[in-house]
Amino acid sequence: MIEQINNFFTIEMIYLWLNLGVLPFWIILFFFPHSFMSKYLVRSIFPFMIFSFVYVYLLYYFFISDFNFKNNFTLYLSLENLSDLFSENGFLIMFWCHFLAVNLFCGAWIVSDSIKLSISKFLTFFPLLITYFIGPLGLFIYWLIRIFFARRMSLYD
């Protein structure tokens, strides 16, 4: 049975499911940020548990296929080493899973913070869209909106 699971969940299939699987969470954040679905499905631990299970499966998958995990630590030594790591599908899919999880976490935080500060969902739509594609820039745009509409500037929560 494990062999069948390994044959079905190839790297390409996991990549496809990661990209399609994150879309419903983002759609809920975009269009229904104040709903119970948003509160209990997106702004909870649920999506990040899914990402964690995928990540653990990927670690298992690469562990049994003799992936060189020690090589991952060389990414901090030079830009060329990082570039070499991104040429490996194993590292690339783990990075992509991490990237999707962090951006979704940032989007969920934006929605939670905007609800707490009573910032309109129409004002948070654009920063959420930017966060979906470019996480840090979307957070910065939301922070600028937060300064003007929440009438307070705070560098920490």
Task: Please place each PLM-identified region on the residue numbering.
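Hydrophobic transmembrane alpha-helical segments in integral membrane proteins
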Residues: 2-23
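Short aromatic-rich membrane-water interface segments that cap or initiate transmembrane helices
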Residues: 6-11, 79-94
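N-terminal signal-anchor/start-transfer transmembrane helix
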Residues: 17-37
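Membrane-interface helix-boundary motifs at transmembrane edges
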Residues: 33-45, 115-119
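Transmembrane alpha-helix/helix-exit interface in multi-pass inner-membrane proteins
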Residues: 52-72
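Membrane-interface interhelical connector segments
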Residues: 67-85
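Alpha-helical transmembrane segments of helical membrane proteins, especially in multi-pass transport
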Residues: 88-107
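Hydrophobic, aromatic-rich membrane-embedded alpha-helical segments
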Residues: 125-148
